[in-house]
Swiss-Prot record:
SUPFAM superfamilies: Acyl-CoA N-acyltransferases (Nat). This is Lipid II:glycine glycyltransferase. InterPro entries: Acyl_CoA_acyltransferase, FEMABX, PG_Glycine_Bridge_Synth. The lineage of its organism: Bacteria, Bacillati, Bacillota, Bacilli, Bacillales. It comes from Staphylococcus haemolyticus (strain JCSC1435). The gene is femX. One of its GO terms (cellular component) is cytoplasm. Belongs to the FemABX family. It catalyses: beta-D-GlcNAc-(1->4)-Mur2Ac(oyl-L-Ala-D-isoglutaminyl-L-Lys-D-Ala-D-Ala)-di-trans,octa-cis-undecaprenyl diphosphate + glycyl-tRNA(Gly) = beta-D-GlcNAc-(1->4)-Mur2Ac(oyl-L-Ala-D-isoglutaminyl-L-Lys-(N(6)-Gly)-D-Ala-D-Ala)-di-trans,octa-cis-undecaprenyl diphosphate + tRNA(Gly) + H(+). Keywords: Acyltransferase, Cell shape, Cell wall biogenesis/degradation, Cytoplasm, Peptidoglycan synthesis, Transferase.
Length: 419
């Protein structure tokens, strides 16, 4: 096993093809981290000209100190049962990390617990310190240890039937409401950033500005690894649908009235009352859409998301939504359409991102888990974070300070949420 010098293209091709590959190990992802103070290096190892493992190393300077942290996000990408490859990856990483004055090397492989026995054993033998099996969204981790994933290598109907029953009803309703899911372009990021700002204000979290999302899009879209989706409500088509709906309801009402006049049966009267209630709701919706048409004849955007790719894996990233017309369930329409798009573009899985495992109802993470669990998902529990310490005194000092910083961040977050 030896060091290999490979191109960015060869690195990315290996990551996309490997079962332990991940979006965060793509070279273009490293470009998106520059705005937040990270820079990157790469290592690769192999034998007989064949790549056996790679690592994209992110470095960030420790404030007021001449040291850095080396972070291999969702790496290394290798077969963790291959001791020789793993050991060589560590050796090459140590050389680079020491040159960059890193006090530690942190990794968090995309390896699930039920497949991670070899990884745990071999990483421990190499001197890595395991950070434990804590909750998926523990503040002690950089990346979530648990995510929710929907298998999408199946037909539209099979994907739909994998959703929980109540969620299927919501998706059906969202499809009938008349919203339009658009695969947008760079210009659409302005609408997306505005939706994200609204979402942050509503849910109490700090949001990124437009330049951050432009950076992600510019870095990854050209290779087909980033797409922007927006959901638009256009009033004119919805008004046309409501008019057709009212015609059908009025016809049904007339038939029921005639039937009730001939024979006054309570069941017929109940049906008549139901139809009249539906007519009233449709009239109210028509008034609402007429008002929207006057104010926004071209429609308004209700939600959006970035859909990312790494080979056969797709990722739902940075979802945002408006406070208006939430009863139209735009996110449900968007999720189903993005899953189908991802499958059509080679993805076998659709990752909803981080979660805890069945949190209590009073947990701040319960709503997130409850939303993600109804989409035919399974819990992907990773083996977690590992640290390889290069500077023991500094590592211990930073580990002691980190809990205080975490508490401060939680306090700020709760203030934003008004708790």
């Amino acid at each position: 096993m030896e060091k290999m010098n490979i191109t960015n293209q060869e690195h990315d091709a290996f990551v996309k093809a490997h079962p332990n590959g991940d979006l965060l190990q793509l070279t273009k992802w490293a470009e998106t981290k520059r705005l937040t103070g990270w820079y990157s290096k790469r290592v690769a190892v192999g034998e007989d000209g064949e790549i056996k493992g790679v690592g994209q190393l992110l470095f960030k300077k420790i404030p007021k100190l001449p040291f850095t942290l080396c972070y291999v996000s969702r790496g290394f990408v290798t077969d963790y049962s291959d001791k020789a490859a793993l050991e060589q990856l560590l050796e090459e990483t140590k050389k680079v990390a020491k040159a960059e004055k890193a006090y530690a090397i942190k990794i968090d492989p995309d390896v699930e617990v039920d497949k991670g026995i070899d990884a745990l054993k071999n990483l421990n033998a190499l001197g890595f310190k395991h950070k434990g099996f804590k909750e998926g969204l523990s503040k002690d981790y950089i990346q979530p240890r648990m995510t929710m994933i929907t298998p999408i290598d199946k037909s539209d109907e099979e994907i739909f039937q994998s959703f929980e029953r109540r969620n299927r009803s919501k998706v059906r309703l969202s499809l009938k409401r008349g919203t339009k899911v658009e695969r947008s372009n760079r210009e659409g990021l302005k609408n997306f950033a505005e939706l994200m700002k609204i979402t942050g204000e509503r849910d109490g979290f700090l949001t990124r500005d437009l330049s951050y999302f432009q950076n992600i899009y510019d870095s990854l879209h050209e290779d087909g690894d980033a797409e922007l989706f927006l959901v638009k409500l256009e009033p004119k088509p919805v008004l046309d649908d409501i008019d057709n709906e009212l015609k059908e309801l009025e016809s049904e009402k007339t038939q029921l009235q005639n039937k009730y006049e001939r024979k006054q049966v309570k069941k017929t009267k109940n049906k008549l009352n139901d139809v009249e209630a539906k007519i009233q709701k449709s009239i109210e919706r028509k008034d609402d859409m007429t008002d929207l048409l006057a104010k926004h004849p071209n429609g308004i955007y209700l939600s959006g998301a970035l859909l990312m790719f790494a080979g056969s894996k797709s990722y739902y990233l940075y979802g945002a939504s408006s406070n208006d017309y939430r009863d139209f369930l735009p996110n449900h329409h968007m999720q189903y359409e993005m899953m189908k798009f991802a499958r059509e573009h080679g993805a076998k899985t659709y990752d909803f991102g981080g979660t805890d495992n069945n949190p209590d109802k009073d947990s701040e993470h319960y709503g997130l888990w409850a939303f993600k669990r109804v989409w035919g998902t399974y819990l992907s529990e990773k083996i977690g974070e590992f640290d390889y310490v290069l500077n023991q005194p500094l590592y211990q000092l930073i580990e002691q300070v980190k809990p205080r910083l975490t508490k401060a961040k939680i306090k700020i977050s709760r203030k934003l949420k008004g708790k």
